[in-house]
């Protein structure tokens, strides 16, 4: 190290030391910072302590007052909770509200629905299908009293009251003589929709005068109901609809949270085939939605909503809400909007994931009507899918035929293309070779792109069906051949041991329909590559990539619904049969003669061909100039 460098480092050190010395905090600043940190710590501790007090308040009240005389206990409760004191202590009991399709249990503690079972459905292991029970749900309103006390309805004991309607249950929270808060639940026969009404009577001096809304906390765990946990979890999400606007949802693949300042029409906790939806006629305000992914166990996700609903303190108007406890069946969900104006429609059918844009349109106006129509006459859904596949293939036949004719033209012209390849060998003559090949196709009336367009036009239907089959609740628990349930995978071999990489992506089983789909796709790929070989040089690795695609489908679809893989298997088989029929019914000699006749006709170039040739000439000129420049060097 030379002298100048050493002096430089010493000066840098002196500057840094001086900067630190002159900018160090004063004792007063250090003391202020310490007091600030202590105050923050005290606030955080107080918040944690208050939260713990709120969580244990009910239990502490019951434990501390259990052995006291009634008069003393009433006095203590009155001091702590005012007019809600008596409702803080009680014995939990349940009232059942049910019809032929839904069974609900309403707890007197909190006056809430704490249990919901769908009678017409079972889980994958044939147990009753329960959407949630008391431990897996919470539904609480926060009440602010006239004396600024904060009380949670989940801590209060309501009293069941018999009404005039046998299909209704009234849970009443008494707050004094002539004043009470009523939660009314009404369930009509054969209906999945529960009307939920909140009405206060004589609460002017009970609740805070500024009360015009009630803060709501709604929590629910989403149980695993289907056989494939990973596959089901892809469809579990928290959906919500804006007032007179579209439906959106939180992330399906990870934990998510969102604050929504706009009013919401409804909030839905959606499983793969079933949903719990809370609907408000007036709308939910200042909503925060949370979705927590649970990687293991019987619970897939935990949903949480904090929001507020309008409330009339004068008791003149009720707060009208509704619950939907039921299946994600498109026709059923759509029926709730029958005869309703566009502004008031619920759009609950958007809980069914049918794709977006044109794919949803194809499902809504073609696939589902066709599926429902066939379902009126055919009760074996394996046969129904077979007939549906045949109908789709018949509809797509003109496009399929046009695509095959295009490949046949390319095939009969292959010898002439090979002659062009021999005439212009090497990379330096690639432009001449391409130009001559395009001229051949143009004169003969063939186009490499004419076979792509028909395939492209088929994609909306193919993608729509990909979205439809896993979402069709009609396939749930429907067996066909070896598949016990067409809504989940059909394992012919399975194992319990966790295998890294394989288990997370492939699963611990082998689906037979998926395997058959893969085999038929490999066969079709091999046959199609041989039939569509035009003699042109292919990109390196293209052949290997074509064979890799079916193997990737095996990994991707192994955990998908067997109804979907069965459809793809049948569809590929029909495509192979169609190709063989085309192959042996089309006279390629006559086709070649027709193309040769086209070559002798005056050639009329399309605008596209003219632009293509101009681009080729420009490329060729650029390449020629580059080669000349290299020679001069």
Mark where each language-model region is.
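Non-transmembrane, membrane-proximal soluble domains of secreted or membrane proteins
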Residues: 53, 57, 61-93, 100, ...
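Soluble non-transmembrane domains of integral membrane proteins
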Residues: 70-71, 78, 85-347
């Amino acid at each position: 190290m030379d002298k100048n460098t050493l002096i430089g480092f010493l000066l840098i050190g002196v500057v840094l030391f001086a900067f630190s010395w002159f900018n160090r905090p004063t004792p007063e600043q250090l003391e202020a910072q310490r007091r600030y940190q202590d105050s923050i710590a005290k606030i955080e501790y107080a918040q944690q302590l208050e939260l713990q007090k709120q969580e244990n308040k009910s239990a502490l009240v019951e434990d501390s007052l259990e052995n006291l005389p009634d008069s003393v206990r009433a006095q203590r409760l009155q001091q702590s909770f005012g007019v809600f004191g008596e409702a803080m202590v009680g014995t939990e009991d349940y009232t059942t509200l049910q019809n032929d399709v839904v069974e609900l249990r309403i707890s007197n503690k909190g006056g809430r629905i704490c249990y919901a079972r769908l009678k017409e459905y079972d889980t994958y292991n044939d147990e009753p299908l329960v959407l949630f029970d008391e431990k897996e749900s919470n539904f609480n309103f926060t009440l602010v009293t006239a004396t600024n006390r904060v009380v949670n309805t989940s801590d209060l004991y309501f009293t069941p009251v018999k009404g005039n309607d046998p299909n209704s249950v009234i849970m009443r929270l008494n707050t004094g003589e002539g004043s009470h808060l009523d939660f009314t639940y009404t369930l009509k026969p054969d209906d999945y929709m529960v009307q939920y009404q909140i009405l206060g009577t004589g609460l002017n001096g009970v609740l805070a005068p500024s009360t015009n809304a009630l803060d709501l906390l709604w929590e629910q765990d989403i149980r695993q109901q289907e056989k494939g946990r990973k596959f089901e979890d892809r469809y579990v999400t928290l959906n919500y609809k804006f007032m007179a606007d579209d439906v959106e949802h939180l992330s399906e693949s990870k934990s998510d949270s969102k604050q929504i300042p706009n009013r919401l029409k409804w909030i839905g906790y959606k499983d793969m085939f079933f949903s719990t939806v809370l609907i408000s006629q007036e709308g939910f305000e200042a909503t925060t939605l949370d979705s927590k992914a649970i990687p293991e166990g019987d619970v897939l996700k935990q949903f949480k909503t904090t929001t507020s609903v309008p409330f009339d303190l004068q008791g003149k108007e009720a707060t009208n809400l509704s619950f939907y406890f039921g299946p994600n069946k498109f026709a059923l969900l759509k029926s709730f909007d029958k005869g309703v104006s566009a502004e008031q429609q619920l759009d609950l059918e958007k809980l069914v994931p049918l794709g977006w844009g044109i794919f949803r349109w194809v499902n809504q106006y073609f696939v589902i009507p066709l599926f429902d129509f066939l379902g009126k006459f055919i009760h074996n859904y394996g046969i129904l899918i077979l007939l549906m596949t045949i109908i789709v293939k018949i509809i797509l036949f003109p496009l399929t035929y046009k695509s095959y004719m295009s490949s046949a033209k390319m095939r009969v012209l292959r010898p002439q293309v090979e002659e062009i390849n021999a005439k212009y060998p090497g990379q330096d003559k690639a432009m001449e070779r391409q130009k001559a090949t395009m001229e051949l196709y143009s004169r003969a009336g063939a186009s490499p792109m004419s076979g792509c367009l028909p395939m492209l036009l088929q994609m909306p239907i193919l993608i729509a069906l990909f979205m439809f089959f896993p979402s069709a609740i009609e396939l749930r628990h429907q067996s066909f051949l070896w598949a016990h349930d067409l809504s989940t995978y059909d394992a012919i071999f399975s194992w319990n041991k966790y295998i890294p990489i394989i288990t997370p992506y492939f699963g611990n089983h082998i689906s037979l329909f998926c395997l058959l789909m893969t085999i038929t796709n490999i066969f079709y790929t091999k046959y199609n590559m041989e039939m569509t070989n035009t003699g042109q040089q292919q990109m390196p690795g293209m052949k290997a990539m074509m064979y890799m695609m079916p193997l990737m489908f095996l990994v991707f679809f192994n955990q998908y619904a067997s109804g979907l893989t069965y459809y793809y298997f049948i569809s590929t088989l029909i495509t192979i049969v169609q190709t063989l029929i085309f192959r042996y019914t089309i006279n390629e000699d006559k086709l070649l003669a027709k193309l040769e006749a086209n070559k002798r006709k005056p050639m009329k170039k399309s605008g596209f061909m003219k632009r293509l040739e101009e681009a080729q000439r420009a490329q060729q000129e650029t390449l020629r100039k580059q080669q000349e420049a290299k020679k001069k060097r």
